[in-house]
């Protein structure tokens, strides 16, 4: 959404852009950075109403400052990338004219999307797991809990704070 065209005016006529076309294509998946900064509450609600949990992928678009304290970080290649500033949980270019990727973590996306849209938690979790796996064509391997799939699991509490992570059936030590 950040770099996409929306409704615009050409002479006296209004024409739809890529965003509106995406809403009209039922089979199209949309990727959403639901960090509470990139998109306002009302747009997240509209996206959820139009596309539903089976066509929304929650994506972090995170850079190396994700999960780190506010400060200076590099976007892209650590030697030749862009300098960025992370302030109040938002990555920005140094002149503060634009976002510079995201510093959101997946749990933040789930928490924020649920809080802003009131979508059921099971649907929001699907948007961060099974729906992206389907888009990538790997839902037979991951994205849900089933015999024969990778045991990539997280456990979180009622505040959607992660307390346990398992990758390929092996617990990660924090």
What do the predicted segments below correspond to?
Residues 1-17:
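Divalent metal-binding pocket/active-site signature
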Residues 14-32, 36, 43, 48-60, ...:
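His/Asp/Glu-enriched, well-ordered alpha-helical/loop segment
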Residues 4-6, 36, 160:
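Flexible, active-site-proximal loop/turn residues at the rims of small-molecule/cofactor binding pockets
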Residues 159-166:
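Short, Lys/Arg- and Gly-enriched loop/turn segments at beta-strand edges
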Residues 9, 38-41:
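Loop/helix-junction capping segments adjacent to catalytic residues or to phosphate/diphosphate-binding pockets
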